[in-house]
């Protein structure tokens, strides 16, 4: 058994504008090459666009988008006697949120459009309305878990 201690996860500080951990997390996810101020500008611009287009609170729409894109189950590869099985596992809330943000940013980047802020705004609005590629990815993940339900007893 390992003698190393368990690493404590550092809490993510809230962002200064919306005072939200989720906004801070998506800023970090969008950031490339250490350019955090650019990432923050993109996120705040996207949230401003959402507020202008929907009329609702931008933070509320963003939180709904993340909640809709969060998976409940996923499959993990487990090797048993020479065969690799896709074993369905429940997703912890922290990992679910991380996956949702990762998918939202990934599919925002792959969208057609001019600016990253507009692409992110469109993806977030789609996710809030239960459409979009991030939601499709969550549904696909759930389908994979459902299809491999027979291997659930290999859970570890």
UniProtKB/Swiss-Prot annotation:
Q: Where is the signal peptide?
A: none
Please name the GO terms that the record assigns under molecular function: rRNA binding; structural constituent of ribosome; tRNA binding
Q: Is-annotated flag, keyword Ribosomal protein?
A: yes
The GO cellular component terms are: small ribosomal subunit
Q: Which Pfam families does the record cross-reference, listed alphabetically?
A: Ribosomal_S7 (PF00177)
Q: Mention one GO biological process in which this protein takes part, according to its record.
A: translation
- Could you tell me which PROSITE patterns the record lists for this protein? RIBOSOMAL_S7
Arranged from A to Z, the UniProt key words for this protein are: Ribonucleoprotein, Ribosomal protein, RNA-binding, rRNA-binding, tRNA-binding
Assembly and oligomerization:
Part of the 30S ribosomal subunit. Contacts proteins S9 and S11.
Which NCBIfam families is this protein grouped with?
A: rpsG_bact (TIGR01029)
Role according to the record: One of the primary rRNA binding proteins, it binds directly to 16S rRNA where it nucleates assembly of the head domain of the 30S subunit. Is located at the subunit interface close to the decoding center, probably blocks exit of the E-site tRNA.
Q: What is this protein called?
A: Small ribosomal subunit protein uS7
What is the organism of origin for this protein? Nostoc punctiforme (strain ATCC 29133 / PCC 73102)
Q: What is the lineage of its organism?
A: Bacteria, Bacillati, Cyanobacteriota, Cyanophyceae, Nostocales
């Amino acid at each position: 058994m390992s003698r190393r201690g368990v690493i404590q996860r550092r809490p993510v500080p809230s962002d200064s504008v919306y005072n939200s951990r989720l906004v801070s997390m998506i800023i970090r996810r969008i950031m490339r090459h250490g350019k955090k101020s650019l990432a923050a500008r993109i996120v705040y611009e996207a949230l401003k666009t959402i507020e202008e287009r929907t009329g609702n609170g931008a933070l509320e729409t963003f939180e709904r988008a993340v909640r809709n894109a969060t998976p409940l189950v996923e499959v993990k590869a487990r090797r048993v006697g020479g065969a690799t099985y896709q074993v369905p596992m429940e997703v912890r809330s922290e990992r679910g949120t991380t996956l949702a943000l990762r998918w939202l940013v990934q599919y925002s980047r792959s969208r057609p459009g001019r600016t990253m802020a507009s692409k992110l705004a469109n993806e977030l609005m789609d996710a809030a309305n239960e459409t979009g590629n991030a939601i499709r990815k969550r549904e696909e993940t759930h389908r994979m878990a459902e299809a491999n339900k027979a291997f659930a007893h290999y859970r570890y």
